[in-house]
């Protein structure tokens, strides 16, 4: 699984047996449909060639005869001139697709249909940066909007380290959200500096900004968040203040805080929500769509993120570390997926490396007689299998790398502080 590949929401198609290669009856077949058939048949022929190579000559001759019949059916199909709209075909389903760019809007009609990027005249698409202090519910909100758990969520602050891209697509729009690390003013490590760089680069690519605040806490101006995240408290980007966790306070308190934020902040609008239960999320979508420009979808409509599967595997392990260990241990850990091998006839093999800064931290991760690391591996494996919808063999190693949070070159290697390349 290579970096830069986008993860699809759909499950991979089932493998077809050799007997399934007989062409179905074709009462009506257009040139575009024939083109799709040739693509599918060529792939299946390569797959069958591997299977038949170890079989008998009779089996091989039968397959060659089937191929000739298939080619004759294709040639016959070229003669049909029926309208494409009248043809019922099965769209090829790809498991992975390369990250698209702005040239998607220049694709021809057939290719746009195959990628699911065809759009109506009023189609809207754009980027949204989600900012806020640590532990205010940014990741929970994005998971609700996207409809799938992409960002890990714990009750500890600064759980999100990387800039997570989530994609919410419908026929009329595509919202691309950046989940950013919590905005912090005092940067303790080089890692903190790199994470804040991620925040600023996300805003630089955005069409609008959501600032999430905790309704349970005393009202505060968002100038500091905009200053640290945007670089300018008087940004010209549309800003929505999201008052999260309204389910934890009384209705009368919500009204007072709404009035305060509307009076003392520069936000264009204020919307109270409960990201945990999804209350108010539709209102946020409506506000975002009112700010996004008209344009085609930047990504295929059936993907939820541009990150590869191995990225989310590492995030799942890191989430379990946050949930299982306390104090400084989760913050001292860096999780790297160093090997990911897909095996069609066996469990996928995944090898994960956990880096810590001290030998004492390594001992805590391992636990007495290795009990703690076994518990971590089991919890991680179960969630990974649920995410991938397949069985995996997970191997976890724990190593000591002193002061890795202060090593800028190492942090860049781990994906921190990279600039966003907006499509």
Swiss-Prot record:
Could you say which protein family the record assigns here?
Belongs to the TRAFAC class TrmE-Era-EngA-EngB-Septin-like GTPase superfamily. Era GTPase family.
Stretch forming the transit peptide: 1-60
Does Iron appear among the keywords?
no
Region: G1; residue ranges are 132-139
Give this protein's Gene Ontology molecular function annotations.
GTP binding; mRNA binding; ribosomal small subunit binding; rRNA binding
Keyword terms, alphabetized = Chloroplast, GTP-binding, Nucleotide-binding, Plastid, Ribosome biogenesis, RNA-binding, Transit peptide
According to its UniProt entry, one GO biological process term is:
ribosome biogenesis
Residues reported to bind GTP: 132-139, 179-183, 244-247
Q: What is this protein called?
A: GTPase ERA-like, chloroplastic
Family annotation (Pfam families): KH_2 (PF07650), MMR_HSR1 (PF01926)
């Amino acid at each position: 699984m290579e970096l830069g590949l986008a993860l699809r929401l759909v499950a991979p198609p089932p493998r077809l047996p050799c007997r399934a290669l007989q062409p179905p009856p074709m009462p009506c077949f257009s040139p575009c449909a024939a083109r799709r058939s040739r693509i599918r048949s060529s792939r299946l022929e390569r797959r069958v060639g591997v299977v038949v190579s170890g079989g008998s000559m009779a089996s091989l001759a039968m397959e060659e005869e089937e191929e000739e019949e298939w080619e004759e059916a294709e040639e016959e199909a070229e003669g049909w001139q029926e309208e494409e709209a009248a043809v019922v075909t099965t769209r090829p389903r790809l498991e992975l697709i390369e990250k698209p760019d702005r040239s998607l809007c220049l694709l021809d009609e057939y290719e746009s249909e195959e990628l699911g990027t065809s759009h109506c005249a009023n189609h809207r698409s754009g980027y949204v940066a989600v900012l806020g202090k640590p532990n205010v519910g940014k990741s929970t909100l994005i998971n609700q909007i996207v409809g799938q758990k992409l960002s890990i969520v714990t009750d500890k602050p600064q759980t999100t380290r990387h800039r997570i891209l989530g994609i919410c697509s419908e026929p009329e729009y595509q919202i691309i959200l950046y989940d950013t690390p919590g905005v912090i003013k005092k940067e303790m490590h080089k890692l903190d500096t790199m994470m804040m760089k991620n925040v600023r680069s996300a805003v630089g690519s955005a069409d609008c900004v959501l600032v999430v605040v905790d309704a349970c806490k005393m009202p505060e101006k968002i100038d500091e968040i905009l200053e640290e995240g945007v670089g300018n408290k008087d940004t010209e980007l549309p800003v929505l203040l999201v008052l999260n966790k309204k389910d934890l306070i009384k209705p009368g308190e919500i009204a007072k805080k709404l009035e305060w934020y509307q009076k003392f902040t520069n936000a264009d609008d204020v919307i109270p929500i409960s990201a945990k239960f999804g209350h108010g999320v539709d209102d946020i979508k409506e506000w975002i769509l009112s700010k996004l420009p008209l344009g085609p979808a930047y990504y295929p409509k059936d993907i939820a993120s541009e990150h590869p599967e191995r990225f989310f595997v590492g995030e799942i392990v890191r989430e379990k570390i946050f949930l299982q260990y306390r104090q400084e241990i989760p913050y001292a850990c860096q999780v790297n997926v160093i090997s990911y091998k897909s095996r069609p006839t066996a469990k996928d093999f995944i090898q994960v490396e956990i880096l810590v800064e001290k030998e004492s931290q390594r001992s805590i991760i391992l636990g007495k007689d290795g009990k703690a690391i076994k518990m971590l591996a089991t919890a991680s494996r179960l969630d990974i299998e649920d995410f991938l919808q397949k069985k995996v063999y997970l191997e976890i190693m724990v190593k000591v790398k002193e002061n890795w949070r202060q090593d800028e070159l190492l942090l860049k290697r781990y994906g921190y502080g990279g600039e966003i390349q907006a499509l």
